A protein has these predicted regions:
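Class I S-adenosyl-L-methionine-dependent methyltransferase catalytic core
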Residues: 1-184
């Protein structure tokens, strides 16, 4: 696996050796960031990577101009891999790795971010809790199915794309405002 774009494009990422973690493919990550460009996220964006695994999505955001990324995963091996990737790429100072259950983390930390990624294991059934508690302007959900906001009127679906088995749902907060410049 590698960083697809930005200043770290082409650099290799270590992955976690466990069946519970399913890394986002290079192709899907590139497509996700192409979709995000149209939303003109702020330069220096604050990013939250939930169920971070190897940290590929959060690291990709840093490579493309995000100022800071918080990466959350409950798996100790995943957190060690993320920390090793950040160190190898020389970007540890722009990221924070937190070992925690995502639900507990979101309940305790409501700091706003510009962009959040949520890439839990397939068959995850806590999507409504994530939608209710994540404080982001844009939420990228990767799952085995489309994630619909349902009765949560804070979110609207911007795009849905399938990349083999994974389905990427891009949600935008209805009340998000503020100056926008591109996250390239």
């Amino acid at each position: 696996m590698r960083v697809v774009g930005g200043v770290l494009g082409g650099r290799r990422l270590e992955t976690v050796s466990t069946d519970a973690i399913r890394p986002t493919s290079d192709r899907a990550r590139e497509a996700i960031f192409n979709m995000l460009v149209s939303l003109e996220l702020p330069d220096g964006a604050r990013v939250l990577d939930l169920f971070a695994g190897s940290g590929a999505l959060g690291i990709e955001a840093l490579s493309r101009g995000a100022a800071h990324t918080t990466l959350v995963d409950s798996d100790a091996a995943a957190c060690r891999t993320i920390a090793a990737n950040l160190t190898a790429l020389g970007i540890s100072d722009r990221a924070k790795v937190i070992r925690s259950d995502v639900g507990r983390y979101l309940a305790a930390h409501g700091d706003p971010v510009d962009l959040a990624f949520a890439d839990p294991p397939y068959r995850f059934d806590g999507w409504s809790d994530v939608l209710d508690t994540v404080n982001a302007n844009v939420l990228v959900c990767e799952s085995d199915r489309e994630i619909e906001p349902g009765s949560n009127h804070a979110w609207q679906t911007h795009r849905v794309r399938r990349y083999g088995t994974p389905v990427v749902t891009l949600l935008v907060r209805r009340d998000s405002t503020g100056p926008r410049t591109a996250l390239s």
